[in-house]
A protein has these predicted regions:
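Non-catalytic regulatory/interaction regions at protein termini and inter-domain linkers
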Residues: 1-156
Length: 156
């Protein structure tokens, strides 16, 4: 069985993500119906409990194991942590990222924490280094075009 894919979007609506996936040939409704695709609003995943997404991922990991799936892939936009600005939110973000294990105990979860480049630029160099897990996480820069918004993703 295929992996379960969780996409937690922040700057785009859930419907926009569905539309974009459909535009590149993904049969979104079939994937949602068979339980292999979940698309959520990241704000609702983090608020009011900042660990909401982690709890969802743990539940999906257990479900994947029960169903004999390969595992779970998680793509999460971290924009929530930049919503109100201030260093306190950056500190909360770094603590959140540090508490995310590179892999789950069963090794069946792979994750991408995605950052809008404008958000990422608000962090100082030491905060950026902490987010990268002192070299334990890989940094991937994604650019649509020279005029489009850029994004960063950390893979664990």
């Amino acid at each position: 069985m295929p992996r379960i894919i969780l996409i937690a979007t922040f700057y785009d609506t859930v419907n926009a993500v569905k539309h974009n996936l459909s535009a590149v040939g993904v049969d979104v409704q079939i994937r949602i119906d068979d339980g292999s695709l979940l698309i959520i609003d990241a704000f609702n995943g983090y608020y009011p409990n900042v660990d909401g997404v982690k709890k969802l991922v743990a539940s999906l990991s257990e479900r994947a194991a029960r169903e004999g799936r390969i595992g779970v892939s998680v793509i999460v936009n971290m924009g929530y942590f930049f919503l109100y600005g201030g260093d306190g939110r950056a500190t909360e973000l770094i603590m959140y990222e540090a508490s995310s294990a590179p892999k789950t105990d069963g090794g069946n979860v792979r994750g991408f924490s995605c950052y809008h480049l404008g958000d990422y630029k608000n962090l100082n160099d030491s905060q950026k280094k902490e987010l990268q897990g002192h070299g334990q996480k890989k940094l991937l820069k994604v650019t649509e075009s020279a005029t489009a918004a850029e994004a960063l993703a950390f893979h664990s």
